[in-house]
Curated annotation (Swiss-Prot):
UniProt protein name: Small ribosomal subunit protein bS16
Similarity comment text for this entry: Belongs to the bacterial ribosomal protein bS16 family.
UniProt KW Ribonucleoprotein keyword: yes
Recorded name of the encoding gene: rpsP
A Pfam family of this chain: Ribosomal_S16
Stretch forming the signal peptide: none
GO MF entry, a single one: structural constituent of ribosome
Gene3D superfamilies to which the protein is assigned, alphabetical: 3.30.1320.10
Organism field: Myxococcus xanthus (strain DK1622)
Keywords for this protein: Ribonucleoprotein, Ribosomal protein
GO terms under biological process: translation
Any one GO cellular component localisation term in the record: cytoplasm
């Protein structure tokens, strides 16, 4: 099972809100996930990025690969040094 950190869309039409989740790479974008480790709200000014730093670091240390977008959000938030994105 290859674990990835990626965004799962939530919110309503025209007002997206995303959860940063750890999930199996074979699961659909908004499907079943292992754990939610953060949130991203692009509707606020400036966009709001939140992470549970302890759980984020746990998943990165266990080999979870962040998506390109999640890797960029981690850099913006300055929470951890992500592994290279796939």
């Amino acid at each position: 099972m290859a674990v990835v950190l990626r965004l799962a869309r939530a919110g309503v039409k025209k007002k997206p809100y995303y959860h940063v989740v750890a999930t199996d790479s074979r699961n659909p974008r908004d499907g079943k996930f292992i754990e939610a480790v953060g949130a991203y709200d692009p509707n606020q000014e400036p966009p709001k990025v939140e992470f549970n730093e302890e759980r984020l670091n746990y998943w990165l240390k266990t080999g979870a690969t962040p998506s390109e977008t999640v890797a960029d959000l981690i850099k913006v938030a300055g929470k951890a040094k992500p592994a290279p994105a796939v």
